[in-house]
């Protein structure tokens, strides 16, 4: 089976990849871009560390303009994030039967309602996976730290390649840093995955060999 994961290069979507590995033969990491920045390269770097194929998808014309319009009208990022997120999920659902992302239990945006999820799955005959939906931030950080090295950075430094970072970049280019400061929280952070901890895999391999040795002796 194949699953497409909406991938930012941060710890959340990277943890999703690790959780899905036992269940899928092929995992494709897909990063959506608004086409005017190179933040997607952060996700490409993280994908190489996870050793899964990566692809960049650019939103169709008009999505960025609508998202920026929402940002400027509401003065808050949530509605714009909730506008672009379902578009990304539905775009991938037309190509892949299984689509996953790193939305968490306590996320306000982006986040799809249960009714929207059921409608999407019924309409496109697909499966939408949210492996982190029952987990809080502290739990996710602890689990991700077990298998990943990552750093936390202010979102204004464009550390990852998610919808918020892309909208920050586009808003600054179109309307200046003042509008970014007005709409987005100044202290918001994102994570960037640096590497996958290979020693964990090596230790597990040694443990498996030890268990096999014990079984053969018994």
Cite the ranges covered by each PLM segment.
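Nucleotide-activated chemistry modules centered on ATP-dependent adenylation/adenylyltransferase
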Residues: 1-5, 9-218
